């Protein structure tokens, strides 16, 4: 009888130990971090942040998470402090800290501080920690890990406060200029220009907003035979004769966070991910497909989000320097007042194409990790009612994202082609000057 009792006691103790340790399986699972990123994306969509601002919201939480999780293997990872502008070293972890939990907490804490709907993030956080407690997370480990995560989050938030974002909220709005070549608000809502002072935001890796200034746009002209007129007519004619594939490409890469719809006197809007959010979705696909660990997943999100952040600064610097008029405005005024682009024209100047710049920068970064033949099925837009698209590489995806803006009727080819070149320069500069690994460690998968 004693032997039988002892046998069942042993089984019970083993089961209890497994239950007590199961929280570690949740925390080391990269899907736990993937879910946190998805939650942040969902709130960004809900709060309708503009593409440049969304890139800021993606980058700072990722940096916070990386600065924690890098301690999981000090022989492998290096700090971003000293590599990113003005960033100093974050506090070091102490005993009893679970680095996966601390990294998650740093990510969620910084993310919550940067969005409007804090209650949505807090609800997610509360449910996550409740789940971990149910899986046996010890109170002492939770307390130490959250305390450390908060320390790092506060360090990143204090540093982020010096990037001129708050100051630019009070800067004057763009004053519409009368010159025919200058950008004007576009239908249907004629919204004010978004982020005309984004060039003032402190870059993370590039030296300055104007470091990779593209060549000048073609001079405005309605005279036949001029390059501007040729490109204008190209947008007009392509828009009138789109085939099924071109339409699908344009819609897949629309990524407009706020599209208004007018029906008589009624107006409603649809919300979608930003262009940067789409590339965060591609990071999710790539890291899952490659079987990356939790720390590797954080690493790839971090470097890609940094490339996106700097690419938006570079692009917006040119947009609000050249202030090029959109095709829709010129076509409606001089060629065809009834012509409509397939996509709703975003409320900011035309040159260069944001999709072209940021997609190329992200693709260069991801190619550095996974190679130039990493085929994937892009399901990012499925939840928004669009079918998945297959790509042979990240660069191919970025090229399709770029040309989609011609099909959408919102960009001239000069903005697309020169935007790709601009994004390539940004991406190459980031991978050359930002190292997440120690010298002996190859950051490829």
Describe each model-derived feature in a short phrase:
Residues 13-16:
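C-terminal motif of bacterial Sec signal peptides marking the signal peptidase cleavage site
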Residues 8-9, 361:
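A periodicity- and composition-biased signal for non-globular, repetitive helical segments
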Residues 1-2, 18:
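N-terminal hydrophobic targeting signals that begin at the initiator methionine
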Residues 2-8:
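Sec-dependent signal peptide recognition
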Residues 9-10, 412:
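Enrichment for repetitive, rod-forming helical segments
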Residues 18-445:
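Acidic/polar surface patches and capping/hinge elements
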